[in-house]
Amino acid sequence: MKLYNLKDHNEQVSFAQAVTQGLGKNQGLFFPHDLPEFQLTDIDELLKQDFVTRSTKILSAFIGDEIPKELLEERVRAAFAFPAPVKQVEPDVGCLELFHGPTLAFKDFGGRFMAQMLTHISGDKPVTILTATSGDTGAAVAHAFYGLKNVRVVILYPKGKISPLQEKLFCTLGGNIETVAIDGDFDACQALVKQAFDDEELKAALGLNSANSINISRLLAQICYYFEAVAQLPQEARNQLVVSVPSGNFGDLTAGLLAKSLGLPVKRFIAATNANDTVPRFLKDGKWAPNATQATLSNAMDVSQPNNWPRVEELFRRKIWRLSDLGYAAVTDETTKATMRELKAVGYTSEPHAAIAYRALRDSLQPGEYGLFLGTAHPAKFKESVEAILGETLPLPKELAERADLPLLSHELPADFAALRKLMMTRG
């Protein structure tokens, strides 16, 4: 597989290089040189296969012979060890639930596949993953790499600034997972990570990798669950399918569009955002004008400069698609709350991100169309806000309940690079 840097097309790398490097020069994103396409008969055959077999074929179409098919299938089986069911919400609407993995969020798919790829590519060479988190990413990375050989994971998070449930999810693992509560905010944690990657001696000594969410391996993994969704739909729904994607950094939408590029039958996509509406405004008037980021109920989408957007534009350019065909909607917190109650009234418990995707879908769905919206996180991950909005108590899923009483294993450090460096070098 060949990929090129969107900021410098002369920089071309293999799949293995893109996975280990993460980003290209000038923080450029990598994009596939070749965009494979399946014939209609191939799509029909793919949709009859099981999740792992189908996903292996999809990933193999991109990765090529860089990873032998048998090995790839083995790694896919290890990564995608949980379902992605479509739950019927209304006669013409379903939710693709992506929260049945170990950390109850869609990031489990990309995180676990990236972990499998990185450990294969690194072989026996020790790797240290260093990343900062405000919650979800840390949990997905921790569980994805937990127990893998020759990998040490160090996760920084702002002390006292993530929910107790989130903290329990990834700070109770131990083993090869080290968590560090930093006396500062998320920006302070990110600054420490940046300093570590600027330290050539530390980088070389520990084999540092960031496991960043824009890693190409995570993006390719996400394509697979769009096919899994369509495979569960009756033929009449497949013919008139509209997909609504809750969008923050736009990785999920990019993956869906790549699935369409492969030949998956999707009539149109909708980019659903909260009040951080840079993309909806751009699609409306053609002006890219990010505002200051606003805090909302759907905090995972509080992004005003989505870093995957250049990949969306590149795909539309390469496929000669029109951006004007991409649906969009920006949903306020008040409408999000009302929509969560509306969904509850038809028997479906949702959280803010999925509710936004549903609202954008419901408001634009035409007669005869079938709508699918993405459920990216388990409602219990937003227990406090969901309970307050719906006026009822949510039971804790076992993934959260079984960790609730475990002791936290985190180190505590000031927001000081020398202290972090010492910890990493003495334990490395």
Feature names for model-found ranges:
Residues M1-G428:
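PLP-dependent amino-acid enzyme catalytic core
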